[in-house]
């Protein structure tokens, strides 16, 4: 059976899985209790490095006992984080890559849709669209192309991820030491201007190096979404 998550404002009330962070925390506690008999205060565990390692250890046991339910919980965390505009993919923060340490502009980002389908955690695919607004904090010039302080430019990015079948997800992906739950995916984005001027910004400035990006093996850390929802 293939499951599908459709994340749009109109559909948010009828999502297949739990719709709020409080419910997610309860689902996590119940999963661990069902598979290991432990009644944990997960909100306290994630405060410390040791607590996070303990929690990943329990999740690893849960996956070994009930992989389907643990998969559902992990993907639910990813889905709910996306609803809150937390993509959690460092490569996707392209503005930091371009102007590292420089406050050249402010970026606002909103997830328009985040569609996920899966048969199992090793067969996950995501298609997403994000809206970006850049507000320039200073004048900027590049090869004769001038941008003025206060200018705003608008972009859409189209993101595709797919789990790598040649690196299947197993209990070994629950890395207690590094505090990561690793999912290997192929990663592709395309960045487009929402209007003629914004597209020209992409074509004529250093942003043109980020119009398209492809990575064959990128490690998603699924644990960061659990932490994000519970903190």
UniProtKB/Swiss-Prot annotation:
Pfam family, one: Lipoprotein_3
UniProt-annotated location(s): Cell membrane
GO cellular component: plasma membrane
Primary subcellular site in the record, as a coarse category: membrane
Lipid attachment locations (N-palmitoyl cysteine): 20
Lipidated residues (S-diacylglycerol cysteine): 20
InterPro entries: Lipoprotein_3 (IPR001595)
PROSITE patterns registered for this protein in UniProt: PROKAR_LIPOPROTEIN
Record's keyword terms, sorted: Cell membrane, Lipoprotein, Membrane, Palmitate, Signal
Topology relative to the membrane: Lipid-anchor
Annotated signal sequence range: 1-19
UniProt key word Membrane: yes
Sequence similarity: Belongs to the MG439/MG440 family.
Name under which the protein is recorded: Uncharacterized lipoprotein MPN_011
């Amino acid at each position: 059976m293939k499951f599908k998550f459709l994340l749009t404002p109109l559909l948010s009330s009828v999502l297949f899985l739990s719709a709020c962070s409080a419910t997610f925390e309860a689902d996590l506690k119940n999963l661990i209790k069902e598979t290991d008999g432990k009644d944990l205060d997960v909100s306290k565990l994630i405060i410390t490095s040791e607590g996070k390692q303990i929690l990943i250890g329990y999740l690893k046991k849960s996956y070994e006992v009930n992989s389907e339910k643990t998969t559902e919980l992990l993907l639910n965390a990813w889905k709910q984080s996306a609803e809150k505009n937390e993509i959690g993919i460092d490569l996707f923060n392209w503005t930091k890559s371009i102007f590292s340490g420089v406050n050249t502009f402010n970026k606002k980002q909103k997830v328009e849709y985040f569609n996920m389908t899966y048969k199992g955690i090793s067969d996950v695919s995501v298609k997403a669209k994000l809206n970006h607004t850049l507000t320039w904090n200073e004048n900027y010039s590049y090869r004769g192309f001038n941008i003025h302080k206060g200018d705003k430019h608008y972009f859409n990015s189209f993101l595709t991820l797919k789990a790598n079948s040649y690196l299947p997800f197993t209990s070994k992906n629950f890395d207690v030491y590094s505090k990561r739950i690793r999912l290997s995916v192929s990663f592709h984005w395309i960045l487009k201007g929402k209007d003629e001027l914004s597209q020209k910004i992409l074509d004529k400035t250093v942003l043109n190096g980020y119009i398209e990006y492809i990575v064959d093996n990128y490690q998603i850390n699924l644990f960061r979404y659990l932490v994000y929802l519970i903190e």
